[in-house]
Every structure is written in C-alpha cells, then in structure tokens.
C-alpha cells in the first residue's frame, strides 16, 4: 500500500540524511481539565501488523510512532492535552527572561478540593542515539521539582539533576555544568528552571534540551491557523529551498492552483492609523507584511487556457484552501526537519480526503524519511480506518462523572470489553466507536427519534 501510493506524494522532498529526533512520551498532571496524571506513549507496539506502511521510525533501538490521533466528544479535554505540551514548551523557552518577582503561568484543575497542588509536566525524547527525560512541577510562585535523566550509548541510565524545594542534587561527573548553580555561586531564583540557567551559562547538555524544545515541537490550533499564514508566506518569499516543496504539497491537494507568488508590501507611514504605537510602526517597517497570490488559469468555453488571474489567497480563497495554505509551511518544515507537529482540530474546514492525505505523508517512510511526527485531534471518524491508522496510533479522550470531570485518555490498545476481548484487527473501528463501544462519545439523556416529538 505505502510503496504504491506514497512515493508519488512528494517526489521532490529532500532526502538528506540527518539525525533522527522524536518524542517517545509526554506526561501531564493538574493542568486545566487534567486532574490526575495522563501519559501519552509514542512507542509502537511491534506485535501488531495493522498496515503495510509500518507507521513508525526506528531510532536508538526504539520503534517510535510517526502519527497519533485523538478522538473524543466536545469538551472532553483534547485541546488541553495539546495546550499542556505548548505550556511546557513556553515555560522552558521563556524561563530565562523571568524576573524573580514574576509569577509562573499556573492554570490548575479547578474541580478538586486540593488547593495549590503543583502542575507537573514530563517529556521523553530520543536525540540520535541519546535518550532524554526532562520534567518539572510548579505553582504560580515557584518551581517545586525538576529532574533530568539521560541514557547515552553503552552507558547506564543517569539522573543528572534532581531538584526539590529543599535540595538540589546533580551528577557532578556527568553534569559538571550544574555545579556552580548547585553550590550557590550562581544564584537560582525560585521561579526559574535549573536547566534554563545552566544553558545560559553554556552548559552543553542543558543547551541541547533547551534547543530541542525551541526547534522541534510545534503546537498549532486548526481553528486558529491564520497565525501560521505568515510562516508559510515567509518561507515562500525568502526560502527558495522550501518553495518547490510547499508548492508541490499545495498542488498535490487539488485546490485549483499550483503556483503561488508572493509580494512584500511597502509600508507608508502616512497611511497608517493615527496614534498607532511607535513600536508597532517600527515592527511593520522592519517586517513588512507579505501577500500571497494564487495563480488561477482563465479558461474559455472550449476549455482553452486564455491567461492567468492572480487571487489574493487571504481575500478570495475558501476557508479550507486558506487553512491548507497556512498549514503547508509547518507541515513541509516538519517533514523536512524531522520535527513534531501537534495540530488541534486537524480536520476542521478540510475535506476528509485531504486530512487523510496529510496523515499518510507522515505514516510513510518514503515521504517521511526523517522521523517527523504528526499528533492531532479530530472529529473525523473516517480516519478510524486500519488502512490509515494503526491501533496503537489511536487514543480516545473523555471527561465524565466517572472521571470526576477530569480528562482521561484511553489508548485503543488498552481497551478491554466485558468478555475480556480487545478490538480485533478486522473490526470496523469507525462503526464500533460511533456505537459507543470505545467510549469517548457524547451521551444524550433522551433518544431523538423524530422531528415531530
């Protein structure tokens, strides 16, 4: 299946060898609708053979999934799982800028009688042959705990850092960059992450962790994809090495055009609204907006091409086409650089076949040679197909009285029916899900049987 369909999707995508870097797990606790600990595993279950095209990349002797799909009712907390990833990333990246009197972005579960309980995040990833696990817990006022665990080739697992409110422990032999912070030579504020300070001081291991968070994971809302419009436009305008791949991606989706031209607008201060803050004016002049035009063929009654008309993509294209255009830059960049892309509501405004095509790009080794990952939420039950997703790539999300209105994750691989059986390879996953056999669907108090009742 993969070899017959995937090679033709992106024949010009770069195949340069590079180090594979992938997320293997993520854990969150006490964040928004998440009360108790939830854990996402991206390790593949190699015992299942659901698809011909594998759907995973082998790195550091670990089989890691290239895609993961989250299904669940509205208000189940799917978005909050992705926001947790974004929050962890944001705290790490911005920790270096915090003054000692600033608070941390604490957004705990509100339906618990345990007040001021720390929020906790942890992520594990493989970076080439090295394995990292990093996490921390915090309240609005301080970092409560912090830990860094690594596994280098032919060496045992090492806990390099363990921080509590009363104690900081480091592995001096394997993590000497932390010594000056531990002994107090370099002061560490209560609201600042240890590895952030260590990286600022030049610590090589800490810099690797910070750089991974800065460059590899990216979280996008499929309902607010306009934020990434400039991302795609700038790539088309300034990155000739990306332009062909982005245009091929767009053209392969059958949206009515294959060519896009970009133009940087001239900013005339005289035409700007009066009273606009000086910093905004300066920013507009330094980074003028880029306009993208789709080139549409003009056809006569005989089907002959009579010319080309330029459509301003933001003004004249449909919502779905604009979304696909906005996502094109992040998707191509993720595939090319082997990053991890989290997309909330991937299917919103897209035809089901377009969503499936995007997932297939990540699941096929031919179009995803660098171990890129696509993690997404969706309401499109057509994706619950064994031809598209492996069973270990599917997670169901629910929030009910049984879960005390806290978000709960149930991987399809962990589902057990009353008779002790599990979902079979030959099951109709979509039908079973809509019938409630896997949970994570809306339940109505009354059956609606007709419009006359």
Report residues per predicted region.
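Short, positively charged and aromatic/hydrophobic N-terminal segments
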Residues: 3, 8-10, 18
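Pre-Walker A-like glycine/lysine-rich segment at the N-terminus of P-loop NTPase domains
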Residues: 13-87
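Conserved Walker B
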Residues: 31, 345-350, 381
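Conserved P-loop NTP-binding catalytic core
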Residues: 55-69, 73, 82-134, 139-143
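Conserved ABC ATPase signature
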Residues: 67-74, 278-332, 340, 346-353
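Electropositive, glycine-dotted interaction segments
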Residues: 133-271
């Amino acid at each position: 299946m993969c070899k017959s369909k995937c090679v033709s999707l992106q024949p010009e995508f770069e195949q340069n060898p590079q180090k594979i870097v992938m997320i293997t797990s993520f854990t969150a606790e006490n964040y928004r609708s998440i009360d108790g600990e939830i854990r996402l595993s991206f390790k593949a279950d190699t015992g299942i053979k659901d698809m011909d095209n594998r759907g995973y990349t082998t790195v550091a002797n670990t089989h890691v999934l290239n895609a993961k799909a989250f299904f669940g009712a509205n208000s189940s907390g799917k978005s909050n799982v992705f926001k947790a990833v974004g929050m962890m990333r944001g705290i790490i990246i911005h920790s270096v800028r915090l003054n000692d009197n600033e608070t941390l972005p604490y957004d705990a579960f509100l339906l618990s009688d345990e007040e001021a309980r720390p929020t906790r995040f942890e992520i594990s990833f493989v970076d080439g042959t090295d394995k990292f696990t990093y996490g921390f817990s915090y309240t609005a006022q301080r970092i409560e705990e912090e830990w860094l665990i690594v596994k280098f080739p032919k060496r045992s697992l090492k806990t390099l850092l363990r921080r509590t409110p009363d104690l900081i422990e480091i592995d001096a032999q394997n993590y000497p960059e932390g010594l000056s912070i531990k002994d107090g030579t370099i002061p560490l504020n209560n609201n600042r992450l240890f590895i952030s300070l260590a990286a600022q001081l030049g610590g090589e291991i800490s810099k690797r962790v910070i750089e991974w968070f800065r460059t590899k994971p990216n979280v996008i809302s499929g309902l607010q994809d306009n934020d990434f419009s400039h991302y795609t436009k700038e790539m088309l305008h300034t990155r000739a090495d990306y332009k062909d791949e982005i245009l091929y991606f767009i053209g392969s989706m059958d949206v009515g055009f294959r060519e896009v031209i970009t133009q940087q607008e001239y900013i005339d201060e005289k035409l700007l609204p009066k009273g606009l803050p000086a910093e905004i004016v300066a920013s507009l002049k330094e980074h003028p907006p880029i306009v993208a035009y789709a080139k549409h063929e003009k056809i006569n009654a005989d089907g002959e091409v009579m010319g080309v008309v330029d459509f301003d993509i933001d003004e004249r294209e449909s919502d779905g086409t604009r979304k696909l255009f906005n996502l094109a830059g992040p998707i191509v960049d993720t595939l090319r650089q082997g990053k991890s892309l989290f997309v909330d509501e991937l299917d919103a405004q897209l035809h089901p076949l377009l969503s499936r095509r995007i997932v297939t790009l990540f699941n096929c080794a031919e179009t995803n040679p660098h171990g890129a990952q696509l993690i997404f939420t969706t309401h499109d039950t057509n994706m619950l197909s064994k031809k598209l997703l492996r069973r270990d790539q599917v997670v169901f999300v629910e929030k009910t009285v049984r879960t005390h209105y806290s978000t709960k994750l149930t991987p399809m691989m962990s589902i057990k029916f009353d008779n002790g059986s599990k979902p079979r390879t030959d099951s109709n996953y979509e039908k079973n899900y809509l019938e409630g056999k896997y949970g994570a669907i809306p339940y109505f108090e009354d059956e609606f049987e007709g419009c006359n009742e």
